[in-house]
Amino acid sequence: TPSTVLVTHLLLAHSVSWPLLANEMAVFLIGTGFALLANLYMASNQQDIDNYRIQVEEQLRKILLRFEYFLKAGDGRNDATLIKELDTILQEALALVYLDHSNHLFHQTNYHIHYFEMRQAQNRILEDMAGNINNCQLAASESLILARLFSKTAQQLSQENPAHELVEEIETCLAVFRERPLPKTRQEFETRATLLQLLRDLETFIKLKVEFYQNYQKVQAS
């Protein structure tokens, strides 16, 4: 490092004089200056990061709309292919933003890191939900309510959307579910339990986004 070179030169000189100090300081400043300039002008990966963000949000949208279809149709066949594809995209995106963060001294990439980590956490929730979707064989009235929520969530995935209204709507739906008549058959009971779990998972999914938005609201406004 420049500081190591400076100390080594002073030790080898066996003396300290103003001309020597001035010369070594000039060497230090030149070396540090070139390093900073190289860092500032190093190519940014911003365009690639933005492209990954678009891919991630589009893939999330496809998954949520697929869930909506399964709930409306009462068809639980789901191999989670889209979720696996999204996991691959997220791994690639995170590798890029980690690299971008290490390569830029003044380039702020914490926002991007936390954004893709938030989406990764959401995808893990979707993976659990996909398994529960497979158990929803009954096209119950509650299924249609939840399907509508999946559709609305798919429409509000943008990083700029705070998603507060979705959380409130889920709370309302939970209250509605509690007031409905008790299931009459074992199948209805199991489906109701699965639907409630899906609703709670969806609430967690959305709250991850709400928390992220609250933490980075100033970044979005700047």
Go through each PLM region and give its residues.
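Alpha-helical rod/repeat scaffolding segments in eukaryotic adaptors/tethers
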Residues: 46-53, 74-83, 104-112, 136-143, ...
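Short, functional N-terminal and low-complexity linear motifs
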Residues: 31-35, 89-92, 115-120
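Conserved amphipathic alpha-helical segments that form helical-bundle/coiled-coil interaction surfaces
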Residues: 83-96, 175-182
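A transmembrane helix-and-boundary motif of multi-pass membrane transporters/channels
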Residues: 1-83
